[in-house]
């Protein structure tokens, strides 16, 4: 094997030592390769691998690095000619599993467990990894603490009156949610510092102590104003010299009078004499802004100043930059009057937060369960307070290696300082890819070292890896052209010069000369909407954008590109559902890396939550009626109305059910035999469930409901059935997690879910088994570290998220708390009101300072997010956005005034831009970027839409699924249906027939028609759980149904073309089954299938095989004479020539081959249904039907069914 040729910089990064080293590794520069090779070189030099501390950002990255090291160490040993060196490499391989390679969280846990006695905790602590449990504990602590303060507990440090003022400053509408949000925000921020209590005590009020008036604000507050003033006067002077005023002489004296104030204004700003500045500026502002068209000066200045004047001065309704500054001054002069009161609120907030932090930590100690941040703080305390432990570790580790250093937090930085001996840090990262500010990572840590290490006198070393070995030149050049004009120190936190620019390193793979076919392509959907509607949407994406991308993706796939080589990157996962639905409509396989959204709002979960509420309290009418109306019991509007009129309007619906059952209501004659039987069946089941509430855990109750009512099977047959089933399983997992946390009782669980929904929170759903060759959909953040041949960036026009800049508190590490203060301006002379209060929410000085810092940091991070997204593409980048259709020139004239200031896009466009699309189009206008532009409309989309015929539409479940998703609308219908419908149905049998049936139900119904008195009722099939990652439900007994279900899932994903023990075992391991279930799947026996002729046929026709094919079919019941839908999923079929080979797996247990004929008879009707569906779908007459019997002794039996 030829040796990889290293660049000089890579070679330096691998071999340099004896000092702290910072490797600035651009995207695609091979940083993981460099780190792995450096470790191998250290081992060769005699450093044992367990003497290296290697920190990665994620567990996945740690796992991948271990695998890479195993491969590289083996390769190095094989190539080594030195026996001693080979021995070292062998020893490293042996110790690799024990090496300190992992996240900082994993290391701090290990350190804390080993030294638990130094921080007074139990060594058997557990991590509060489940958000639900930590939310529960935190909520309880918060509520108890608030209650204590409101009860006037004298032992506490805030009086009741002052505490009530504190709450009112952040909350409204008589609740404390606003205050609670503020407390949680501050707690989270403090937890990311190296010593939360110290920060809260010493830094939290620093801003209030520093910024008490306008004159305390930094030079940054006035520097832009000076620039804007100079620009303003320059415009006026140009107008006097070359403009309309010079030519016509109109208003020359008045203009000169304005210019006379120039020096006084500039001097007032320099001295921070804001009173003088305000008076002088407002006089100028009035001269320019006020007047009529007869005012010669005004008319002349309007012509000369045009848009630039508006930007600087503006009007009251739309103030310019200078007028905004004046407004800030006025605001500042007002807030100065209330600074003392605001400081008192801030001080009380500090006291409460400290008390909350300590109480919450004490509660976690009692539970012996901690958050990751707690463990990190314990670890820091252990190292700071115990020099012996600290020095032992420093002596033990020869080098401290940190991957993704740009995403390090201050807590992690403190850990590194404590572990390092001062000259053995090896840090790898890329400041341009620091995108985790929302997790409180601080890119400033990287930047500070980057600048200091670059100084000649600094003993430490900076190494730059600029070559990109991932992408084509077209992608790299476009990326460079964007960011060299976008980033600088002021905004972006760095200048994107030659040293930062990407350099193509894969010249042998991709040509240096640009090819226009690979130019990045900007797809703009021209939509019939206003600009406000477009820009006000932070993350909303239109169908047109997705369809435009889908058509391009379809073209790529048809040209031979594998779906797995294509990625769609989005700002937020909130659009995942829509993207998946549209891509599937184009027959494009798709994977949602972060799943579908709104788990708690999915209809199948909403129905189950109503059922739990009704079980907990049947007197809750809405949930009880929802339960009756749901597919589990199927009461229709007529039946519910008949029940409703059994009592007065104010009588509970549950009481009306009891009256109906006893025939003692107001209108007993309306409870016909059919409804009576239906009510009895419901009451029997409902009563049983209510009794079980105190006998079995909630998650087992849920599964009992799922299986007994066939509800799990039912939702699985609907559109997106696998995801619906995953949602139901997720609800069960959450219930189990809740109970394992020490909480018991259905009432508390329902209350918890209700609170989540009230606060618009969601819970994570369970992942389902995903197709391997599919287009990936993920957020920009999720894509970091990945690469794809073709990348689509969606929703470019969406606005940047500026919600954090509008919150009641904004925090900074240096200045602490910035908060808004609610003042009563009733006594102010300019305020006239008849109300007893004139409450106004104002920004305090620390808030203004923190807001400005946060805004710049947020825009800088947005630039880096865009950089990360661009650099995921190997071959081609697609940018997808949206514009309004009312614009001329395709809606792009907005950017005509975009200009460069030097090499950088003007501050006006960088600061005022609302999204990525603004930046890109502004630069396109100013610099002519190397990209294609394609503007398309809805009509063009429809015209160009492709027709796909690769597979018949088995999923004709849309109408029924929509009916299911809108099932809750029945409540309005009930209100309208108050008239008594006193009649018998002409088709009474139809009331007993479900409108939707599975093949199992059809089979059962077929049996029922043949039963004679005294015969045994047929047993229903087990419910199949398709495509699920099974969760651990404790030490319960594994049922035959679970084993059968898992076996079906395995058969679906097993690659029949590689039917061997190794391949099948690997597939089984990847599927994530519970270990107990996995051990019950007999792969050796399954492999005997491929010793048969039928098995060989399957392995030879994998490309013609369709597995897990859903279908729907309309049938007519012979007794009810009514139509109903049959839905199901057949395990698979093979289409060859003019016939179809249908097969279905059966896991029924049998020990004697004589039982096979009985099994064949049992499933004959079901297989005939599948056959009928395939005949209709493919218009094929010949369907050969086979049962693959997996439950027999020693081997798999294949049986053909007769027609």
From Swiss-Prot:
How would you summarize the oligomeric state and partners of this protein?
Answer: Heterodimer of AddA and AddB/RexB.
EC number(s) recorded for this UniProt protein = 3.1.-.-, 5.6.2.4
What InterPro entries has UniProt attached to this entry? AddA, DNA_helicase_UvrD-like_C, DNA_helicase_UvrD/REP, P-loop_NTPase, PDDEXK-like_dom_sf, Restrct_endonuc-II-like, UvrD-like_ATP-bd
Q: Which GO terms describe its biological process?
A: double-strand break repair via homologous recombination
Residue span, UvrD-like helicase C-terminal domain: 503-785
Keyword flag Secreted: no
Per its UniProt record, what PROSITE patterns does this chain match?
UVRD_HELICASE_ATP_BIND (PS51198), UVRD_HELICASE_CTER (PS51217)
GO MF term (any one): ATP hydrolysis activity
Residues binding ATP are 25-32
Q: Which reaction does it catalyse?
A: Couples ATP hydrolysis with the unwinding of duplex DNA by translocating in the 3'-5' direction; ATP + H2O = ADP + phosphate + H(+)
Keyword Cytoplasm attached = no
* Alphabetized UniProt keyword annotations: ATP-binding, DNA damage, DNA repair, DNA-binding, Exonuclease, Helicase, Hydrolase, Isomerase, Nuclease, Nucleotide-binding
Question: Which co-factors does it depend on?
Answer: Mg(2+)
Q: What does this protein do?
A: The heterodimer acts as both an ATP-dependent DNA helicase and an ATP-dependent, dual-direction single-stranded exonuclease. Recognizes the chi site generating a DNA molecule suitable for the initiation of homologous recombination. The AddA nuclease domain is required for chi fragment generation; this subunit has the helicase and 3' -> 5' nuclease activities.
Q: What is this protein called?
A: ATP-dependent helicase/nuclease subunit A
State the family named in the UniProt similarity comment for this chain: Belongs to the helicase family. AddA subfamily.
Q: Which organism is it from?
A: Lactococcus lactis subsp. cremoris (strain SK11)
């Amino acid at each position: 094997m030829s040796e990889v040729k290293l660049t000089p910089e890579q070679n330096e990064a691998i071999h340099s030592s004896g000092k702290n080293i910072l490797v600035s590794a651009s995207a695609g520069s091979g940083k993981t390769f460099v780190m792995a090779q450096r470790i191998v070189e250290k081992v060769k030099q005699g450093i044992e691998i367990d003497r290296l501390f290697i920190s990665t950002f994620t567990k996945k990255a740690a796992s991948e690095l271990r695998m890479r090291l195993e491969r590289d160490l083996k390769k190095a040993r094989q190539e080594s000619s030195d026996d001693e060196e080979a021995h070292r490499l062998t020893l490293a391989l042996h110790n690799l599993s024990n090496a300190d390679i992992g996240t900082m969280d994993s290391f701090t846990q290990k350190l804390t467990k080993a030294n638990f006695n130094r921080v007074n905790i139990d060594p058997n602590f557990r991590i509060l990894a489940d958000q639900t449990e930590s939310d529960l504990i935190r909520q309880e602590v918060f509520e108890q603490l608030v209650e204590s303060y409101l009860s006037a507990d004298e032992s506490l440090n805030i009086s009741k009156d002052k505490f009530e003022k504190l709450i009112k400053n952040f909350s409204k509408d008589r609740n404390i949610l606003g205050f609670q949000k503020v407390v949680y925000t501050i707690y989270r921020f403090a937890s990311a510092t190296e010593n939360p209590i110290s920060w809260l005590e010493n830094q939290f009020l620093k801003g209030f102590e520093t910024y008490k008036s306008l004159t305390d604000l930094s030079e940054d507050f006035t520097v832009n104003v000076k620039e804007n003033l100079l620009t303003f006067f320059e415009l006026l002077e140009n107008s006097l010299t070359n403009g309309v005023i010079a030519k016509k002489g109109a208003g020359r004296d008045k203009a000169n009078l304005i210019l006379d104030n120039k020096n006084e204004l500039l001097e007032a700003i320099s001295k921070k004499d804001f009173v003088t500045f305000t008076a002088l500026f407002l006089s100028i502002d009035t001269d320019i802004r006020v007047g009529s068209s007869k005012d010669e000066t005004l008319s002349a200045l309007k012509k000369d100043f045009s848009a630039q004047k508006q930007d600087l001065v503006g009007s009251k309704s739309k103030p310019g930059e200078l007028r905004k500054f004046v407004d800030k001054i006025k605001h500042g002069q007002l807030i100065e009057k209330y600074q003392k009161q605001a400081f008192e609120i801030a001080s009380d907030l500090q006291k409460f937060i400290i008390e909350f932090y300590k109480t919450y930590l004490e509660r976690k100690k009692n539970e012996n369960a901690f958050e990751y941040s707690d463990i990190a703080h314990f670890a820091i305390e252990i190292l700071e307070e115990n020099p012996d432990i600290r020095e032992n570790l420093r002596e033990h580790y020869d080098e401290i290696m940190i991957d993704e250093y740009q995403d390090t937090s201050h807590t992690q930085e403190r850990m590194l300082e404590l572990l390092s001996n001062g000259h053995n840090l090896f840090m790898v990262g890329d400041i341009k890819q620091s995108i985790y500010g929302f997790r409180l990572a601080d890119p400033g840590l990287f930047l500070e070292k980057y600048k200091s290490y670059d100084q000649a006198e600094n003993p430490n070393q900076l190494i730059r890896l600029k070559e990109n070995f991932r992408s084509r030149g077209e992608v790299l050049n476009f990326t460079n052209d964007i960011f060299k004009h976008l980033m600088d120190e002021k905004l972006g936190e760095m200048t994107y010069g030659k040293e930062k620019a990407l350099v193509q390193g894969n010249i042998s793979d991709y040509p240096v000369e640009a090819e226009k076919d690979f130019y990045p392509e900007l797809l703009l959907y021209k939509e019939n909407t206003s600009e406000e509607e477009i820009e006000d949407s932070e993350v909303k994406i239109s169908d047109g954008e997705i369809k435009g991308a889908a058509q391009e993706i379809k073209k790529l796939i048809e040209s031979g590109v594998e779906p797995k080589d294509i990625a769609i990157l989005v700002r937020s996962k909130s659009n995942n559902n829509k993207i998946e639905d549209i891509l599937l409509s184009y027959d494009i396989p798709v994977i949602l890396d972060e799943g579908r959204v709104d788990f708690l709002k999915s209809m199948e979960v909403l129905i189950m939550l109503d059922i739990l509420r009704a079980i907990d309290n049947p007197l809750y009418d809405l949930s009880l009626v929802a339960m009756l109306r749901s597919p589990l019991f199927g009461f229709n509007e007529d039946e519910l109305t008949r029940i409703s009129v059994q009592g007065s309007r104010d009588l509970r619906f549950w009481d009306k059910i009891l009256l109906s059952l006893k025939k003692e209501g107001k209108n007993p004659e309306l409870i016909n035999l059919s409804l009576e039987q239906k009510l009895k069946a419901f009451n029997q089941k409902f009563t049983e469930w209510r009794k079980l509430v105190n006998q079995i855990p909630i998650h087992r109750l849920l599964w009992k409901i799922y299986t007994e009512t066939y509800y799990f099977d039912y939702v699985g047959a609907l559109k997106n059935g696998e995801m619906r089933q995953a949602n139901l399983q997720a609800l069960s997992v959450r219930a189990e997690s809740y109970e394992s946390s020490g909480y018991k009782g259905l009432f508390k669980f329902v209350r918890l879910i209700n609170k989540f929904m009230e606060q618009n929170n969601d819970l994570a759903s369970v992942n389902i088994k995903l197709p391997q060759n599919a287009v990936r959909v993920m957020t920009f953040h999720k894509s970091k570290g990945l690469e794809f041949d073709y990348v689509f960036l969606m929703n470019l026009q969406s606005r940047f998220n500026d919600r954090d800049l509008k919150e009641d508190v904004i925090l900074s590490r240096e200045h602490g708390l910035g908060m808004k203060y609610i003042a009563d301006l009733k006594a102010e002379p300019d305020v006239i009101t008849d109300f007893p209060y004139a409450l106004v929410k104002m920004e305090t000085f620390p808030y203004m300072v923190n807001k400005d810092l946060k805004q710049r940091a947020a825009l800088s991070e947005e630039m880096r997010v865009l950089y990360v997204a661009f650099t995921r593409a190997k071959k081609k980048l697609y940018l997808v956005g949206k514009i309004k259709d009312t614009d001329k020139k395709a809606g792009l004239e907005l950017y005509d005034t975009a200009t460069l200031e030097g090499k950088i896009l003007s501050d006006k466009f960088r600061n005022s831009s609302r999204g990525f699309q603004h930046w890109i189009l502004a630069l396109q206008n100013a610099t002519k970027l190397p990209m294609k532009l394609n503007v398309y409309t809805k009509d063009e989309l429809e015209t160009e839409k492709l027709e796909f015929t690769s597979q018949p539409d088995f999923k004709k479940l849309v109408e029924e699924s929509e009916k299911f998703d809108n099932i809750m609308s029945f409540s309005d219908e009930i209100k309208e249906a108050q008239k008594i419908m006193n009649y018998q149905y002409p088709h009474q049998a139809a009331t007993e027939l479900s409108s939707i049936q599975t093949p199992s139900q059809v089979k059962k119904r077929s049996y029922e028609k043949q039963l004679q008195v005294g015969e045994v009722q047929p047993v229903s099939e087990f419910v199949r759980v398709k495509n699920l990652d099974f969760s651990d439900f404790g030490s319960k007994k594994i049922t035959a149904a679970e084993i059968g279900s898992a076996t079906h899932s395995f058969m679906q994903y097993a690659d029949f073309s590689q039917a061997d023990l190794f391949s099948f075992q690997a597939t089984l391991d990847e599927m994530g089954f519970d270990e107990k279930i996995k051990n019950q799947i007999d792969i050796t026996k399954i492999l005997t299938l491929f010793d048969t002729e039928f098995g060989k046929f399957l392995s030879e026709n994998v490309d013609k095989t369709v597995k897990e094919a859903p279908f729907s079919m309309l049938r007519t019941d012979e007794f009810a004479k009514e139509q109903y839908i049959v839905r199901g999923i057949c395990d698979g079929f093979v289409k060859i020539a003019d016939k179809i080979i249908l097969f279905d797996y059966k896991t029924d247990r049998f020990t004697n081959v004589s039982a096979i004929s009985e099994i064949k008879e049992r499933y004959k009707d079901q297989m005939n249904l599948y056959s009928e569906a395939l005949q209709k779908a493919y218009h094929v007459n010949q369907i050969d039907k086979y049962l693959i019997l997996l439950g027999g002794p020693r081997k798999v039996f294949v049986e053909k069914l007769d027609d």
